[in-house]
Amino acid sequence: ASFPLCLLLRDKGFNTQIKTHLEIDEKNGINCTTGSLGHGLPIATGMAFARKKTKKKGRIFVMISDGECQEGTTWESLLIASKHKLDNLIIIVDYNKLQALSKINDALPLENLEKKFKAFNCHCIAIKKGHDFKSIINGLKKIKKDKKPNVLIVHTVKGKGIKEFENDTIWHARQLKGEEITIGRKRLNLK
């Protein structure tokens, strides 16, 4: 997807075009959106499979959360992607170890996430500095065309950059208001 940063910042975060659950916007590269956890990877797997079968070039990128790695459809999709050697499928996992209401491991343990993906015959790239664009770009450069799905496990901190919000599940879906907006903008060096 591609959109200007100003859309995220317009009206102090209110009335922005960027919503919690995006709408389809093919012009800007958003070909599909989901709301419920675990639906993104099955759709992306189908898109990658269709491209492979019709011999169309290009790759399918999908971003999923670590919470989605607790959904059965995620792992079923990996079985399919692996069986059909979908090396045109690039899965980016936002691994912040938190979900809406608790820590990931409190709900369902996900230790050794990289080993889990490798067990499903995926090529894995761990990005320890998930907020560093150079690290992410270097990870993307390591994507292989070796008949395996590619998975980038991007280690992040929920709420990064605003110390009052970091690693606090209360901010999962809560909209900022009043002084919180001022604090957030100050911490992110925004005017």
Q: Predicted segment positions?
A:
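Acidic, glycine-rich active-site loops and adjacent beta-strand->loop/helix elements
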Residues: 1, 64-71, 95-99, 131-133, ...
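Cofactor-binding active-site loop characterized by glycine-rich and histidine/acidic residues
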Residues: 1-83
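Short acidic, glycine/serine/threonine-rich loops at helix termini
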Residues: 6-9, 73-75, 101-105, 137-138, ...
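A glycine-rich helix N-cap at a beta->alpha junction
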Residues: 13-20, 81-94, 118-122
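Conserved thiamine diphosphate
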Residues: 56-57, 105-139, 190
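Generic beta-sheet signal
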Residues: 58-62, 89, 146-154
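A short alpha/beta connector and helix-capping loop motif
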Residues: 71-96, 151-154
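Glycine/aspartate-rich loop-and-adjacent alpha/beta segment that forms the canonical ThDP
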Residues: 133, 137-191
